[in-house]
């Protein structure tokens, strides 16, 4: 009987080792979803009224910007970026009429964290005019978003993941 018990225990141990050995190994590319990879910036966002907003700085001023994948150009309000005299005057035709606007180089920082991976700074021309954005100060459009290799909205963790090209 003891021989049968020893064989049974040995068989269980062997099956356990085989089961453990057959588990897939975790490779370096399989870090948890919240791990920050090189070239990634994880910018916190909030959702209000089915829209995604990020805290930002525009020319050093605090701002709340709407992320709009349907907007071709990044557009800002005059109260956020008062324009200086510029020759880049344009007319923007909208559903409710036309607005005089200007194409102006602007300094942006998306995200307010001091952590390098949790904000992203860049310069980009933007359209500045007497636009109304509800509770936002401006819109980040595809001209900015398409400058990244990928843009992922992680709603579970409330971050937008910007992967540099």
Segments predicted by a language model, with ranges:
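Pepsin/retropepsin-fold aspartyl endopeptidases
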Residues: 2, 15-165
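Short hydrophobic transmembrane-like helices used for membrane targeting/insertion
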Residues: 7, 12-14
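N-terminal secretory signal peptides that target proteins for export/translocation
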Residues: 1-7
